[in-house]
């Protein structure tokens, strides 16, 4: 059987890097994404490709690159994200847009980019990394909670939309982790 091909957004550090390293050790073909792969010249765990979840064209390029190299894509792990803290009334509009573009709109665009390939294959899995914060409005983290809650709901809707195509979609909602976000 061919090795499963995995694409992990935010794969250069934190949870994404740990997942990618583990899957590589288990025999998966892993591609991790980062906005600036040139910042990781010594990264050897798996191949890093350029992808900014806030840039739809870079998403298309990265997904096309993986598919052109592997002729398939079996698993997407939507992991890239940013944190934001502060009182809602004092959070600048630009920061609100940034957290929604990164934590919600970006993963949606990545899912839209991989779904045609998965549908064509008749199989695939999408795992969205949400957060326990998406199940409750945490004080001083309201916008972060909102983005993760929205991603959880779109995951639920898309799971029902794609169930007849052989594509499974779920989310994983970790608690606090010491990462660089």
List each model region and its residues.
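Residue(s) in the substrate-gating loop at a strand-loop-helix junction
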Residues: 131
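A short, exposed helix-loop element centered on a Lys and neighboring polar residues
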Residues: 111-112, 156
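N-terminal Rossmann NAD(P)H-binding glycine-rich loop of SDR-like oxidoreductase domains
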Residues: 12, 16, 20
């Amino acid at each position: 059987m061919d090795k499963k091909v995995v694409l992990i957004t935010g794969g250069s550090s934190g949870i994404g890097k740990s997942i990618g390293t583990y899957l590589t050790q288990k025999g998966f073909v892993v591609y991790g994404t980062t906005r600036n792969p040139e910042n990781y010249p010594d990264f050897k765990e798996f191949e890093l490709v350029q992808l900014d979840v806030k840039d739809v064209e870079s998403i298309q390029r990265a997904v096309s690159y993986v598919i052109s190299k592997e002729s398939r894509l079996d698993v997407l792990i939507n992991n890239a994200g940013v944190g934001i803290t502060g009182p809602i009334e004092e959070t600048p509009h630009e920061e609100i847009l940034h957290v929604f573009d990164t934590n919600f709109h970006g993963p949606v665009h990545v899912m839209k980019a991989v779904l045609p390939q998965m549908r064509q294959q008749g199989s695939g899995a999408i795992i969205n990394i949400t957060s326990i914060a998406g199940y409750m409005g945490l004080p001083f983290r309201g916008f972060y909670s909102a983005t993760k809650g929205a991603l959880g709901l779109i995951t639920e809707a898309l799971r029902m939309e794609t169930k007849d195509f052989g594509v499974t979609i779920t989310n994983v909602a970790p608690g606090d982790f010491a990462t660089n976000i």
